[in-house]
């Protein structure tokens, strides 16, 4: 089968022929139709996770998948032809979703794709969406509160802005002037601040005592924490946790994406109902995925989708 792989850290992703996997007990072979790019993929390429996770080369890149069940291993309840989507969640970095087929476990990182969920949207939903759910659930914004989303134009940020706005909170999003600002406003941001300028001054002008809650998805965590009012909350996807904030009078939570079936189903239902938009900015075919990574590295708004089949 064709897959996007790297043979070593720092190598350019290329489309190569690899062996089609076979599902074992409790596993599902998914024929992938759609995927998307995430920051995790870049971290794998450049070796940023080599001390945290075991890697076995060649590594097939890609976390998000949408497609159909091709075959199942012993003890699996799904059947061939079922529409599914999710996130490849394995302890070793080797198998990924930027491939014609991927094997995943039955119990975690996979859910049924409901009617009305477009495959392209399903393929750009799992990882970033579940991370955003974790962040907003940790912050638990209330109607009338002010929530700052730092890194609002990325995949996680675009979902987080929408989820925060749905709570009735006032959302302040970071974005550059122009297209980025219009993008986050379209997602539900009430105010937009330019993170390339004096962020603290802009926040003070909007919320003099600091914001009630902040989603830290990019930039310096200490600077982000300083923008939160005393007694407020900060949730970070970048490893900033309570142990690093013992002197701060705020509650800090470190969040990792948790794409369990319930979270994936929650995201899918929100998309189908129209409560959540999948913000696909650009779409590339598998053979052009190198261009996709170049666009991702240059910075883009929303998600970069990949059509596999």
At which residue positions do the language-model features occur?
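Glycine-rich phosphate-binding loop and adjacent beta-alpha segment
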Residues: 218-279, 308-309
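C-terminal hydrophobic helical "lid"/dimerization subdomain
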Residues: 1, 264-309
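NAD(P)H dinucleotide-binding glycine-rich loop of Rossmann-like/cofactor-binding domains
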Residues: 54, 87-151
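Residues located in well-ordered beta-strands
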Residues: 2, 14, 31, 66-68, ...
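Glycine-rich beta-strand-centered segment in the early N-terminal region that forms part
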Residues: 19-37, 49-90
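Short amphipathic alpha-helix with an adjacent loop that forms part of the alpha/beta core around
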Residues: 198-209
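Short, glycine/polar-rich helix-capping loops at beta-to-alpha or helix-loop-helix junctions
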Residues: 97-99, 175-183, 241-242, 263
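Mid-domain Rossmann-like dinucleotide-binding core that forms the NAD(H)/NADP(H) cofactor-binding site
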Residues: 80, 122-197
